[in-house]
Swiss-Prot record:
SUPFAM superfamilies: Nqo5-like. It is a peripheral membrane protein. NDH-1 is composed of 14 different subunits. Subunits NuoB, C, D, E, F, and G constitute the peripheral sector of the complex. It is found in: Cell inner membrane. GO terms for molecular function: NADH dehydrogenase (ubiquinone) activity; NADH:ubiquinone reductase (non-electrogenic) activity; quinone binding. The gene is nuoC. The keyword Transmembrane does not apply. Pfam families: Complex1_30kDa (PF00329). Signal peptide: none annotated. InterPro entries: NADH_DH_suC, NADH_quin_OxRdtase_su_C/D-like, NADH_UbQ_OxRdtase_30kDa_su, NADH_UbQ_OxRdtase_CS. This is NADH-quinone oxidoreductase subunit C.
Amino acid sequence: MSEKLQDLAAHVAQQRPGDVISAEVVQGELTVTVKPEGIADFVRFLRDDAGCRFTTLVDLTAVDWPERVERFEMVWHFLSMWKNQRIRVKAGLAEDAMCPSIVEVYPAANWYEREVFDMFGILFSGHPDLRRLLTDYGFRGHPLRKDFPTTGYIELRYDEVQKRVVYEPVKLAQEYRQFDFLSPWEGAQSVLPGDEKRS
């Protein structure tokens, strides 16, 4: 399988040299890093090229890296049922940059892009209906950003006296705790149970 993925990585890099920044196989998964401005054409290539045929969009999400210049990392996962292969596509995105929508190529991206907009605040140019999906329309902020307070800004609850839902500022008995961006898992070796027996 690794040889097939290496061949696929070479094929993608050769066919789309203007889009591909890097292509590598790590732990049996192919990850291709691309320039965000060409993502729509790149995923169209992945779908239509006879050597790829990635016809299924499995997932679309983002990762927040507050310390990086390109704060957000967009991540798309595709599946080729014809080739029995998966590919991960990544693109760095500055905080104030817009990401081109891929809804025209993969209609399934519609709600994924709405979710990423709602949770991270990333705007998608060319999206037909970019509005909040999971939070209330009056919600302030984007909950999956690492600078979003873990307590939120407002509390939503049902008031028995008023017989309706009310919004109130969050009041806590303890002080706000600052989130530590360093992860204890960074640099960890991914060893699965049973791997130690192979050596």
